[in-house]
From Swiss-Prot:
Biological or metabolic pathway of the protein: Amino-acid biosynthesis; L-serine biosynthesis; L-serine from 3-phospho-D-glycerate: step 3/3
UniProt-recorded Gene Ontology molecular function terms: L-phosphoserine phosphatase activity; magnesium ion binding
Protein name stated in the entry: Phosphoserine phosphatase
Transmembrane residue ranges: none
Taxonomic source organism: Halobacterium salinarum (strain ATCC 29341 / DSM 671 / R1)
InterPro entries linked to this entry: HAD-like_SerB, HAD-like_sf, HAD_sf, PSP
Length: 211
């Protein structure tokens, strides 16, 4: 079975969930600057995620939920996911972002992934605590890709990875085919192809006999 592993924030969705949550908390500029440094590889993803999560501590959990509910896939992403799955391709999402936002975006598009690996912002007493938990805080996407491939009965060498940021590089390097969607500086060197839209991504996958 062919497997395509997608990053979410900046790839299947154009915006970064945590940046939008930070805007609600009044720390948007500070968090966006840390996000950009992390995506350029200037700061470890785990450190950047913890630092950003700390900045939104105290935000009502309901405000974060409202952000999750408003997350949407970028133009053409839902159609591409549906086409892949209809063709027997296994679609998984490997994200350092947050599973509730991924679920809301897929639900709004009327499509589903075969699997989602992501993180969550911890809340207590109705407020974000500033902590973040999940398999892709310290864990890396190459390991997540290997696990997804093993579950699907395939190998990373036979898989496609699609991402944009520095934290996607491990899975881009592990996959047989690596595709960047408007990749951040330095990430393009790890990509076999780069695209700027879901339509272009679909054409690349078509060329590989996948979509």
């Amino acid at each position: 079975m062919t497997l395509v592993a997608f990053d979410f924030d900046g790839t299947l969705a154009e915006s970064e969930m945590l940046d939008r949550i930070a805007a609600r908390a009044g720390v948007g500029d500070e968090v966006a600057a840390i996000t950009e440094r992390a995506m350029r590889g200037e700061l470890s993803y785990a450190d950047s995620l913890r630092e950003r999560a700390q900045l939104v501590a105290g935000l009502p959990e309901s405000a974060a939920a409202a952000v999750y509910d408003g997350v949407r896939l970028r133009d053409g992403a839902g159609d591409l996911v549906a086409k892949l799955r209809d063709g027997g391709v296994r679609v998984v999402v490997l994200t350092g972002g947050f599973k509730p936002g991924v679920a809301a975006a897929f639900d709004a598009a009327g499509v589903a992934a075969d699997g989602v690996v992501g993180n969550r912002l911890v809340a207590a007493d109705g407020e974000l605590t500033g902590a973040v938990e999940g398999p892709l805080v310290e864990g890396t996407k190459d390991d997540a890709l290997r696990d997804a491939c093993e579950a699907a009965g395939t190998t990373p060498a036979a898989a496609v990875a699609v991402g944009d940021g520095a934290n996607d590089v491990p899975m881009l390097d592990a996959a047989g085919t690596a595709i960047g969607v408007d990749p951040k500086p330095g990430v393009d060197a790890h990509c076999d192809h780069t695209v700027s839209s879901m339509d272009a991504l679909g054409r690349v996958l078509d060329d590989h006999g996948i979509a």
